[in-house]
Amino acid sequence: MKGYCDMRGFLTFLVLRLISKKNISGEEISKEIEKRKGSKPSPGTIYPVLKYLKENGLIHEIQDTGKLKRYTITKKGERELKIATKKFISIFCDMKEEFN
C-alpha cells in the first residue's frame, strides 16, 4: 500500500481513524458515523471497507464475546493513517482557501 493514494476515499480514512481510537465493532463504527454525519451507513457500506482494510494489513479482527467481532489497528495501519491524515488535511486546507 502506498499511503493515501491507495486508500479508497474518505470513508476508508474515517473507519481506520475510528478503529485507531479503540477496538470497535462494525455496528459501533456505523453508529459513530451516524453521530457525525446524521445518517447511518448500511452494513453493505461498512463491511467492504473493513474487508479492504483487513486484506491490506491495516487492521486485525478480534473475536469478542459470542459472535461479536471487533477491529484493532496494526502498526502498518497506524503508519498509513498518519500519511492519509496529512494528505486529507492538506486537501481540505486547499479547498478552504479556494472557497474563502
Residue positions per predicted region:
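Short, Lys/Arg-enriched, disordered terminal segments
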Residues: M1-C5, E97-N100
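N-terminal helix-turn-helix DNA-binding core of bacterial DNA-binding proteins
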Residues: K2-T45
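Sparse recognition of residues in long alpha-helices and their boundaries
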Residues: G38, T45-I46, C93, N100
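Short, hydrophobic-biased segments on the C-terminal half of alpha helices
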Residues: Y47-Y52
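Glycine-centered, phosphate/nucleic-acid-interacting loop/turn motifs that mediate DNA/RNA or nucleotide
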Residues: G57
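Short beta-strand "wing" residues that participate in macromolecule-binding interfaces
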Residues: E61
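Basic, amphipathic "hinge/linker" alpha-helix immediately C-terminal to the N-terminal HTH DNA-binding motif
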Residues: T65-T85
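Amphipathic alpha-helical dimerization/coiled-coil segments
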Residues: R79-N100
